[in-house]
Amino acid sequence: MNKIFIVVIIMLITSCATIPAPTVRPFADSHDWVLVEDITYQIGESGLAITVPKGFVTDFASIPKTLWSFGLSPHGPYSKAAIIHDYLYWSQGCTKEQADNILVIAMKESGVSVITVTTIYAGVHLGGESSWLSNKTERDKQFPKIIPAEYLKFPDNVTWTEYRQELIKKGVKDPEFETNPAYCKLGNSREIPKHG
């Protein structure tokens, strides 16, 4: 009986998908951060995953300072979901709507409160278009946002804006991104996908 109980508990714990804690390094202004290792998010029980590569630069959640006093800031229980969302907004393999919905799913799986999920979703849904278009413009200009391994040891006193300019001068470009990866279809809903 005890063995069955332990197996059930293990199954419950492992079935609660969460995004692993990222290992990041800040740039000098602590506005932008770089992933020191890949982060892979298994989306619900779908069997599909999003991997944000080592070297990706994120600002976590782009929440205006005016909202920080209301308990929302760039860093919170939604930070891991924000990294996934930043990557989806940068790579643009999914539509903006799909990226926003995957953010909701990731926040739900991270245990973010319903009120916070709703507030952040409203922000990206209504106000994220400028970031989406800005990212497209930067990608069209072939600006990098994924730092190759050989450039990950940057000085502690450099900002992302400064370091990015150095990378551009050296001809660093992002890898090609997959168009319409299989996980995008999960963004046609805001519900955590079940098995199958």
Question: Which sequence ranges carry the predicted segments?
Answer:
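Extended terminal accessory/targeting regions
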Residues: 16-196
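Sec-dependent N-terminal signal peptides
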Residues: 4-14
